[in-house]
Curated annotation (Swiss-Prot):
Top-level EC class as recorded in UniProt: lyase
Gene that this polypeptide is encoded by: Pdxdc1
Classification via Pfam families: PDXDC1-like_cen, PDXDC1-like_cen2, Pyridoxal_deC
Positions where Phosphothreonine occurs in the chain: T687, T691
Record-given protein name: Pyridoxal-dependent decarboxylase domain-containing protein 1
Cofactors that this protein relies on: pyridoxal 5'-phosphate
Any single biological process term in GO: carboxylic acid metabolic process
Amino acid sequence: MDASLEKIADPTLAEMGKNLKEAMRMLEKSPRRTEEENGKKPVSEDIPGPLQGSGQDMVSILQLVQNLMHGDEDEEPQSTRIQNIGEQGHMALLGHSLGAYISTLDKEKLRKLTTRILSDTTLWLRRIFRYENGCAYFHEEEREGLAKICRLAIHSRYEDFVVDGFNVLYNKKPVIYLSAAARPGLGQYLCNQLGLPFPCLCRVPCNTMFGSQHQMDVAFLEKLIKDDVERGRLPLLLVANAGTAAVGHTDKIGRLKELCEQYGIWLHVEGVNLATLALGYVSSSVLAATKCDSMTLTPGLWLGLPAVPAVTLYKHDDPALTLVAGLTSNKPADKLRALPLWLSLQYLGLDGIVERIKHACHLSQRLQESLKKVDHIKILVEDELSSPVVVFRFFQELPASDSAFKAVPVSNIAPAAVGRERHSCDALNRWLGEQLKQLVPQCGLTVIDLEVDGTCVRFSPLMTAEGLGTRGEDVDQLITCIQSKLPVLTCTLQLREEFKQEVEGTAGLLYVDDPNWPGIGVVRYEHANDDDTSLKSDPEGEKIHTGLLKKLNELESDLTFKIGPEYKSMKSCIYIGMASDDVDVSELVETIAVTAREIEENSRLLENMTEVVRKGIQEAQVQLQKANEERLLEEGVLRQIPVVGSVLNWFSPVQASQKGRSFNLTAGSLESTEYTYVHKVQGTGVTPPPTPLGTRSKQRLPGQKPFKRSLRGSDAVSETSSVSHIEDLEKVEQLSSGLEHDNLEAHSPEQPPRATDLTARQTEALQNQAQHQEDDHSQVEELERLR
């Protein structure tokens, strides 16, 4: 069996199979008996393949599970974060298998064992997290414990609820108070589980003037409670946060506890900051949670334990009500939910538990201290000494801001400044978060959208550090990546307005304001048949933009270009990505306009040529038919009779008629094929008009990519050479215009020798000057053209 397990590529599955085999060997008192089949059973076609025959061995089944987990080899690898399962993780996984085995014991042994496991785990959690004189309820879904607590509160406040049911609630409606910063969907979940209507929920807003904007407004909550009491409602339960789901801020739990005691409201606390109760130093706001009526803990996430249930600790003296509410159960299977946590806590010990929580807090503090030294990064910090969650975002520094602007609470910033910052930086922060997630996946970053602060990046090591194995070096790498992305972010933000002005000042281009695009901007080319009022798709415009995208990508610039429909309509647009500081926006916009115009003209030229060819063919058919009729009139009817016509043609041969017509694509005209048959050479036809030359492209240095500004003051090009280069270009332009004027005079019989001498002298002068400009390839090419 051990040799077979070594064939499995996934070490986690192999280790788990080995642990399960070892546990079964130790726990079983007698060797397992194998059942012999009495005869070969007939194979039914309705039975799936894996179930046919005598079954599969464990190695084959584990290999099948491994293939299902990692997918086929042909599929592209997905960038999914796989949790790092350590020894403590194997203990948690082993607990589920042991739970299934323990459930086969006799009832008395099972009762004693499950009672011991449940009581030990409850006592350990109460001592670790400073919650005295409480009971524990273990549940798989995090919100399930709160739903049971709400049911317990209903039974406690409504004594006749067991007899009269919801009629009691109808006469005096219960009210459950939730913070506006609570996790999404929590209120709807509670109403669905309890069978209560949505008006029983009361959403308490957060602070707007003083304190954190993610903390519950206590004064407003008290006003809501008084209003509900006056209306004949019953304030039932309040859910407070010790670490909100978004930014990890803690409510004023001490003040909320006093308010709940005054009105007889059940206080329930949840949040990631409850993990810090295991540390030696705890902030006063979090420490106040130990006096609440109930709290929900998630030790599996904090300690990196897979498939470990959440725990709800509560205080209540009536066992009958807790049994009715579902918080306690006589079923052994319900008590065995604590077995994985019971094994894992013993394996880690108190020092291991505290060390893991302390490590996560140190990671967050390390990131906070490093981000303070980074410009253009704002940190949403509640308590710098104890906050285990770091939320930050990129922002454009205001002119009147000082060095302490980044560390102050967001509520102290002017609302107008926050609005401008959010409007211009949300897309860039979303791009920054996605880039950091790819570059440093060990940090477990998430991108969040906050109602007040906009798009931010969250680092919560308490929820991810143990599973991903986050270290201090990963935080340092994260800071390095942030610093490397800041120049691109600041330059892109600065170039946005310049790009908008250039596009609005260029004929044929329309600036598209897309707030969700993080690049320089979005532009659309308006062709001749473009309808601005229509929001439907434009096939002609899509064709032009597709060709434009291909041309722009062929330039091999540092910019990224994408095509997609405008977010307000179905029309195609060109999306320009992030940029650095040396991007020439004017050249970029001019190139887009000229290239799109050329594509449109070429498309129309092809359409016109198709129409000309079609009309030419029709005209040729008409002329040939007319020529055939004239030939019949000249030859007469007798020549058309087979025998008679041959005799007449022998006595009086007819002259050869025209052979046909040819269509000159260059000239766009019909021509006779007589010249071709006589001279055996196809005629040149009419000389086509000269093709107009496009606009002269910007002169670039060797190796310089498109849309790059000239490097002034560099070693490659000095200021003197730049000035002389510009002067030489002007002389070449003057020379070309002078040559055109002299050529016109040369055709007149008045002064032909003088014009020729002038041209020769100017050419010779420029040729001598070009010998000192060996690196100026553009001048050499111009001189060769003039020569």
